[in-house]
Curated annotation (Swiss-Prot):
Produces ATP from ADP in the presence of a proton gradient across the membrane. Signal peptide: none annotated. The gene is atpE. Disulfide bonds: none annotated. One of its GO terms (biological process) is proton motive force-driven plasma membrane ATP synthesis. One of its GO terms (cellular component) is proton-transporting two-sector ATPase complex, catalytic domain. This is V-type ATP synthase subunit E. It comes from Borreliella afzelii (strain PKo) (Borrelia afzelii). InterPro entries: ATPase_V1_Esu. One of its GO terms (molecular function) is proton-transporting ATPase activity, rotational mechanism. Keywords: ATP synthesis, Hydrogen ion transport, Ion transport, Transport. Belongs to the V-ATPase E subunit family. The keyword Transmembrane does not apply. The keyword Transport applies. The lineage of its organism: Bacteria, Pseudomonadati, Spirochaetota, Spirochaetia, Spirochaetales.
Length: 199
């Protein structure tokens, strides 16, 4: 009986140990599975976070590059406008300077009036401030033509230059510094744009 009790105790111990080992193995296996799931979720989260970060970085780079391109375009357009304005102002200043020479203006007026039909009645309108000196030069150079139908008058609306009006048909030709500069600018502007064109 002693053996039976001993065997029974040994069997209980053995069964208890086996059960404890089985429970222990189940706990370890469950812990390993949970750990693997946690690692897998963490790796997936890390991959998603990395992909999101890379997309955000690429989007930021793309936006920054586009903003840089736009800023460069705006800068170029601004420089072109400033150069165009500088060119236009310089052209106008040069025309005003040339038109400030009364001898040049007198020669120009004479050449223009000589080229038109002799029967036409012309009115030459001059800037008020230059009128007296220009009138003297024109009277000397035109002589008889003044009596034959060319009339010289002062005109307030001209800063530099002159206007010629054909009396019998009512046409007026504007040779003021502003108009000549505008015509020259319109003529030269396409060429100027080609010179300064960057993009």
């Amino acid at each position: 009986m002693q053996f039976e009790v001993k065997d029974l105790i040994n069997k209980i111990k053995k069964d208890g140990l086996e059960e404890a080992e089985r429970v222990s193995n189940d706990i370890i296996l469950k812990a390993k599975r949970e750990a693997e799931e946690i690692v897998a979720r963490a790796e997936e989260s890390a991959r998603a976070l990395k992909a999101k970060s890379e997309k955000e970085i690429n989007d930021y780079k793309s936006h920054a590059l586009e903003a840089s391109r736009q800023a460069i375009r705006d800068l170029i357009i601004g420089v072109e406008k400033n150069l165009k304005s500088l060119f236009e102002n310089t052209l106008k200043d040069n025309v005003v300077e040339v038109f400030s020479d009364n001898n040049f203006l007198a020669e120009l007026i004479i050449k223009i009036t000589d080229s038109w039909a002799k029967e036409e009645k012309l009115v030459v309108q001059l800037n008020e401030s230059d009128f007296s000196s220009l009138e003297q030069i024109l009277r000397l150079k035109l002589g008889n033509k003044l009596a034959q139908g060319i009339e010289i008058k002062p005109f307030k609306g001209i800063s530099k230059g002159f206007k010629i009006q054909k009396k019998n048909i009512g046409l007026q030709y504007d040779f003021s510094a502003e108009t000549v500069a505008d015509i020259l600018f319109d003529y030269l502007n396409p060429r100027f744009k080609e010179i300064i064109k960057v993009v």
